[in-house]
Amino acid sequence: MNIFKWGKREKVKTPEIDFGKGKFLSTKTYGNDRGFSCCFRQWKATHSHCSLLHGYSLGFKLVFECDSLDERNWVMDFGGLKELKNWLEHNFDHTIVAAKDDPKLGELKALEKKGLAVVRVFDNVGSEKFAEEVFKQMTIIIERSKYQKKALNPTVRVK
């Protein structure tokens, strides 16, 4: 490699770098522009107002990692994530998310029967639990893609 050093051209030995190996990262966000409008309550937090229904504008950031890029030099084919996008919209866009053990679950579902709400039931609620559920869903999508030999990079994983 030729470089200039104080006005003179010099040959400098550069280390060999294998760009085909190592860890590569790529990120994808959902809801980052306006968020998914959903509400939930932490019914076990009886000591605070978090036990009341309250709304959020949820956004999700996924980080993908792989050891080698695919044949297109991608970590992740984001076109293969429509299933996750649909799942996020189904569960978090203009919904009430309730814990399956919420003692008021019947009353929340009654709102849905009256056409006043869309209620989704999760094992648990909260930002951390939602992140865990998204991680699980994305892992399922990736593993299914590997099994079906679809477009997703076979070495990719959610970080």
Question: Where are these predicted regions, by residue range?
Answer:
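Charge-rich, low-complexity N-terminal segments
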Residues: 2-159
